[in-house]
C-alpha cells in the first residue's frame, strides 16, 4: 500500500493530478486546509454528476453548511434516506482543519477522477485527474 497525501483548499486539490499503477492500492490521507466543507470523492464523471443532487439535498436540509456539517441532522435524515449518511467507501466529507482517509484499490481501467461535489465546487473546477502510469 502506497500513501498519497491530498490537501483540499477552497476549490482545488493538491496535487491536481494523481498518478497510480493499475492494480495498486493507495491509502489517501486527505486534509481540508480550506475554510469551507469539502468532499474527496473517487468516481467517474458520470457518477459525480449523479451524486451532486444528493449533496444539494444535504444543503437544502441544512445538514451541509458552508463551514460545517450538522452531524445530528445527518443522523436523523439518514434514518429516512440512507444517502444522507454520506457513508460511501469512495468518499470522505471533511470540515475545515479535519483529516480523513480512504484506502482504494485501482483494479480497472475505468476513467476515474477525484472531485468535490459540494454544490458549486465541481462546477468551478474542484477536480483532480487520476492517471494510470
Which stretches of residues belong to each language-model region?
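Generic secondary-structure microfeatures
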Residues: 10, 24, 30-34, 44
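Beta-strand signatures of extracellular beta-sandwich domains
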Residues: 39-43
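Extracellular/periplasmic metallocenter environments
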Residues: 12, 31, 35-36, 66-71, ...
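Short edge-strand/loop segments of extracellular domains
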Residues: 44-50, 132-133
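Surface-exposed loop/edge segments in extracytoplasmic proteins
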Residues: 50-51, 90
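N-terminal edge beta-strand
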Residues: 1-26, 83
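Outer-membrane beta-barrel and related beta-rich outer-membrane complex signature
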Residues: 52-56
Amino acid at each position: 500500500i502506497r500513501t498519497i497525501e491530498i490537501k483540499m483548499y477552497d476549490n482545488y486539490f493538491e496535487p491536481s493530478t494523481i498518478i497510480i499503477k493499475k492494480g495498486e492500492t493507495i491509502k489517501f490521507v486527505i486534509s481540508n486546509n480550506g475554510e469551507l466543507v469539502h468532499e474527496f470523492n473517487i468516481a467517474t464523471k458520470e457518477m459525480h454528476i449523479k451524486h451532486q443532487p444528493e449533496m444539494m439535498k444535504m444543503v437544502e436540509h441544512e445538514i451541509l453548511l458552508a463551514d460545517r456539517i450538522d452531524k445530528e441532522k445527518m443522523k436523523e435524515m439518514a434514518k429516512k434516506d440512507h444517502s444522507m449518511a454520506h457513508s460511501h467507501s469512495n468518499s470522505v466529507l471533511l470540515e475545515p482543519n479535519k483529516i480523513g482517509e480512504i484506502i482504494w484499490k485501482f483494479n480497472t481501467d475505468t476513467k476515474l477522477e477525484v472531485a468535490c461535489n459540494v454544490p458549486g465546487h465541481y462546477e468551478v473546477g474542484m477536480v483532480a485527474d487520476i492517471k494510470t502510469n
